């Protein structure tokens, strides 16, 4: 399947099943610890570097922008993304979720920071993703099933994508986002405008001091 022709491609075993399982267990542990920290008021409910449960796209589901382990995957997977898309890419950000029973990912297209994206299956119960390779809206779409370690590469700004209601218990996915290198806009948007990968969104536009470079 050609990404250049279809604007999407499925890559089996993009990372090993063992690595996917490690990251999946790590992220579930982080979710559980975060819940205790928030509920005990050990940390502020507005603290985002432990993840959130108030994501508007999938409410009441544990989600995390820029987790350091996921951002490391963002770096590690980039050469694979470049090989299979034929594009030179720059990292923008990662976003991970552990979906729960009843969750739905509504049909949508992405914004510029998600120009070239992948959804990487970390583990849990099966939950296919759908996308419409025609670039139109409201089409039946193509059903894509991923096993742990598999990923779907897609042009997020061009192709509508979604997931229907989840009937399993949980499912761990991480979205890894990139821009095509070459434009002024892409250069300005590098790392989603953060000075370093792994920093929360609060650091967009921030400048590092000499002591932190």
Where are these regions (language model features)?
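Non-heme Fe(II)/2-oxoglutarate
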Residues: 1-85
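A short, polar/charged loop/turn motif at coil->beta-strand junctions and beta-hairpin connectors
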Residues: 2-5, 90, 123, 170
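Fe(II)/2-oxoglutarate
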Residues: 1-4, 201-206
């Amino acid at each position: 399947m050609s990404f250049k022709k279809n604007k999407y491609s499925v890559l089996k075993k993009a990372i090993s099943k063992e690595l996917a399982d490690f990251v999946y267990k790590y992220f579930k542990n982080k979710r559980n610890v975060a819940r205790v920290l928030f509920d005990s008021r050990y940390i502020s409910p507005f603290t985002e570097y432990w993840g959130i449960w108030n994501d508007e796209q999938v409410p009441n589901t544990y989600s995390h922008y820029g987790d350091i382990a996921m951002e490391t995957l963002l770096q590690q997977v980039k050469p694979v993304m470049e090989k299979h898309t034929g594009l030179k890419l720059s990292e923008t950000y990662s976003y991970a979720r552990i979906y729960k029973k009843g969750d739905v990912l509504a049909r949508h297209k992405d914004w510029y920071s998600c120009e070239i994206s992948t959804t990487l299956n970390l583990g849990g119960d099966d939950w296919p993703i759908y996308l419409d390779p025609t670039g139109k809206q409201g089409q039946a779409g193509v059903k894509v099933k991923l096993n742990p370690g598999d990923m779907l590469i897609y042009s997020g700004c061009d192709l509508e994508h979604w997931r229907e209601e989840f009937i399993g218990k949980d499912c761990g996915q991480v979205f890894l986002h990139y821009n095509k290198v070459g434009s002024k806009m892409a250069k300005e948007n590098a790392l989603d405008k953060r000075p370093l990968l792994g920093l929360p969104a609060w650091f967009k536009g921030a400048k590092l001091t000499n002591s932190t470079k």
